[in-house]
Amino acid sequence: ERQYEQEMAMRKELEGGNYTAEHPYVVVNPYFVNPLTALLLFNTEKEEAVTLTVKGKEAAGDITHTFPKAKEQILPVLGLYPEYDNTVVIMLEDGTAYDVTVTTEKIENMPYQADYINTTSDYMNGQLMFVTPAGDSLAGGYDYRGDCRWHLVEPFIFDMKPAANGRILIGSNRLLNMPYYTAGVCEMDLVGKIYTEYRIPGGYHHDQFEMEDG
């Protein structure tokens, strides 16, 4: 309900404001569970395939994605650094680009840097390494440098798998029974919007898989 109300408020603000690629509506942590994400909302005069780049602390850390054509742009921003003035570049189809600063706040009880990582930017190829907990810790995503670029502040636990529709499946944050039985499995996107909680009689823990029929 809280996420639904937030989404309705964001849409109302977009419709009532004069937001453009140069001056977008920026919402950090739009669904309350991932403070290293944001939404950029604005309108374009015609349908455009907008490209977003979250600038890394060095060039190899850039994360870029091009979105399908639309006039109403509601664009997820992934890969922000914590407690940092992140630069996000909005590029239109004609090559016009605008820089937007997305500032994130300090996150308590979260390691900003992995203790050890041994990989390269070429091997990671713009991807993040996701780690999920089995207990009191919280899920995170780390880049080739070991910098945290994705973090859930609610205890979604155990296995995290990509779903066929592009979302993720991860254990619910609602504890059902001790020591680790949760209510079921959540289907969410990487920004943190929860689409469905699949409640499992007796609870869920450790692992799940998506069947061929979904």
What feature does the model see in each segment?
Residues E5, K12, G16-V54, Q73-I74, ...:
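Histidine-/acidic-rich catalytic cores in large beta-rich domains
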